[in-house]
Amino acid sequence: MSNTDTIVAQATPPGRGGVGILRVSGRAAAEVAQAVLGKLPKPRHADYLPFRDANGTTLDQGIALWFPGPNSFTGEDVLELQGHGGPVILDLLLKRILTLPNVRIARPGEFSERAFLNDKLDLAQAEAIADLIDASSEQAARSALNSLQGVFSTRVNQLVEALTHLRIYVEAAIDFPDEEIDFLSDGKIESQLNGVMADLDAVRAEAHQGSLLREGMKVVIAGRPNAGKSSLLNALAGREAAIVTDIAGTTRDVLREHIHIDGMPLHIIDTAGLRDASDEVERIGIERAWQEIEQADRVLFMVDGTTTQATEPEQIWPEFMARLPKTLPITVVRNKADVTGETLGIEDVNTHSLIRLSARTGDGVDTLRDHLKQSMGFTSNTEGGFLARRRHLQALELAAQHLIQGKEQLVSAYAGELLAEELRLAQQSLSEITGEFTSDDLLGRIFSSFCIGK
């Protein structure tokens, strides 16, 4: 399939609706307009017209919008046909358009891809379109819109520009030693480099917040049977998401619930009680529980406060702790404070946090919510923030590593050539975010995840 073909796709979701939109982009868009509408609409004006088949029979009637390139979303000629949202009507109109020469169905994300290739959007802005559609909270939607409007790209471009100026100075001093620019010892380069590194750290912190808004946090509730895991899931979800009984082993499979804490998505997973089970179904559930635990961002180790006074997880259940990944964050939750009479609250016990609460009554659950938010470094003040993806975080981290290595070359070895190379690599990593330096394979993976009509 060629990028010079004219493409068409339904821009509205499949199924019945009040309005259905077909979008056409490419060189033959004007021919499509003449064939279906009998005329070329006035640019950027809404025309109410019949949509006709090859025999001149009216298939539907609705609004036609004409956006001649390059002043369009894709940078090409674009035609939008807004008719009634019946699947049969839209299918007939789509088939009519596809009978015309050099017109084909668009690939997923191809409209946004063409906007990127025609310099109407950079890559971060194009990704923000999909993120805006998929936003699961108001804050995520606002941050995605900020990214679409170029907030993230501007921050990245400022870093790239600063690195460019720094590289010019360093490489000029290397290429013209007779000018006696003592850039290595006068401290000017190191000062500028420190400034860029500080700015990069600030962008990384904002990107981390944006990633939390987009990706959320995966929290697994684990522990012995009847510790109150399902009750805690229900308390956090604010509804009866899981069945709760006094019978050990009631939960036999993984239960998932998605909530928000001040805008941050939280993926809570309730698991089967961990024990040596004789029942085959329960054993499968326990194995799935361990799979979820190993992939978690944090584990809530649920403890029945009526069965032990211990507060350190290694004392409560050493076998459980021995199997956990060493770097996995743990929060010990002593449940049933309404029975034991323990004081509600949170405290640090060695390397773990300990929370006392009652999942049944809900007392102390707000403390747990605050703890989860703080443990991920999430702040609810995201005014002017932007969304970020994992690849963005990786690119920012790689750029930071190159700057650290470059500074080491400057401070310890006075190696200007090596410093210049690290600056170049850092600039290249940042340019991958906006698509200034990006492989075709990466572009294919990004745009293939979009909707067909986007």
Curated annotation (Swiss-Prot):
Family note: Belongs to the TRAFAC class TrmE-Era-EngA-EngB-Septin-like GTPase superfamily. TrmE GTPase family.
Location in the cell: Cytoplasm
Gene Ontology biological-process annotations: tRNA methylation; tRNA wobble uridine modification
Functional description taken from the UniProt entry: Exhibits a very high intrinsic GTPase hydrolysis rate. Involved in the addition of a carboxymethylaminomethyl (cmnm) group at the wobble position (U34) of certain tRNAs, forming tRNA-cmnm(5)s(2)U34.
EC numbers on record: 3.6.-.-
PANTHER family per the UniProt record, alphabetical: TRNA MODIFICATION GTPASE GTPBP3, TRNA MODIFICATION GTPASE GTPBP3, MITOCHONDRIAL
UniProt-recorded name of the protein: tRNA modification GTPase MnmE
Domain TrmE-type G per the UniProt entry, residue ranges: 216-377
Signal peptide: none
Binding locations of K(+): N226, T245, I247, T250
Keyword tags: Cytoplasm, GTP-binding, Hydrolase, Magnesium, Metal-binding, Nucleotide-binding, Potassium, tRNA processing
Superkingdom of origin organism: Bacteria
The keyword Lipid metabolism belongs to this UniProt entry's keyword annotation: no
Cofactor(s) essential for the protein: K(+)
